[in-house]
Amino acid sequence: MICKAPRSITSIVAALFAATLPLTATRADPSSGERLARQWCATCHVVASDQKQADADVPTFAAIAKSPGFSRDKIAYFLLDPHPKMPNMSLTRAEAADLADYIATFGTTR
């Protein structure tokens, strides 16, 4: 006799598996991340090479991308639950991945 798991259990297992995948496993869009950065982040962070001024007490995107231990996944997860000094941007997982991918571009020669 073959036992078939109910569809609801299969769906739950699939959802749990998907939740454990890295946020950036899907194809992120750095150009979308740049738009989000200019909208949400530029008040405090230097988010582009053409930006001349921001809050002096926060790291630039270049400094974040070049910091030891930087990873797209760590930044994406952080953006979903930011620290108290950051606004709650209510980003989707895809938006967080896009923004993390954009930040990562500062770790390479631009």
Model-based region annotation:
Residues L21-L36:
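Electrostatic cytochrome c docking/interface patches
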Residues R38-A48, L99:
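The canonical Cys-X-X-Cys-His
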Residues S90-R110:
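C-terminal capping alpha-helices of c-type cytochrome domains
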